[in-house]
Amino acid sequence: MFRFIKDSILELKKVTWPKYNEVVGNGKQVFWLVLFVSIFLGIVDYLMFLVVTYVF
């Protein structure tokens, strides 16, 4: 178990971590994408609701 933890720490030191600006930029992109997709799906859901209530 201790070897696993030691090896994990050594591997984490080799990782190239992203800069703060990259994290913030990617976070903004994810936020806008999620917002756009949720609005789009909300509109599609509402239109399908209207079609179903009109047909039945």
UniProtKB/Swiss-Prot annotation:
Membrane topology: Single-pass membrane protein
Molecular function in Gene Ontology: protein transmembrane transporter activity
Pfam families: SecE (PF00584)
Major localization class: membrane
GO cellular component: plasma membrane
Stored Gene3D superfamilies: Preprotein translocase secy subunit
SS bond partners: none
Residue spans crossing the bilayer: 30-50
Subcellular location: Cell inner membrane
Superkingdom of the organism of origin: Bacteria
InterPro entries: SecE_bac, SecE_sf, Translocase_SecE/Sec61-g
Keyword terms of this UniProt record: Cell inner membrane, Cell membrane, Membrane, Protein transport, Translocation, Transmembrane, Transmembrane helix, Transport
Keyword match Transcription regulation: no
One BP annotation, GO: intracellular protein transmembrane transport
Subunit note: Component of the Sec protein translocase complex. Heterotrimer consisting of SecY, SecE and SecG subunits. The heterotrimers can form oligomers, although 1 heterotrimer is thought to be able to translocate proteins. Interacts with the ribosome. Interacts with SecDF, and other proteins may be involved. Interacts with SecA.
General function of this protein: Essential subunit of the Sec protein translocation channel SecYEG. Clamps together the 2 halves of SecY. May contact the channel plug during translocation.
Family membership noted in the UniProt record: Belongs to the SecE/SEC61-gamma family.
Name assigned to this protein: Protein translocase subunit SecE
Species this protein is from: Borreliella burgdorferi (strain ATCC 35210 / DSM 4680 / CIP 102532 / B31)
Gene: secE
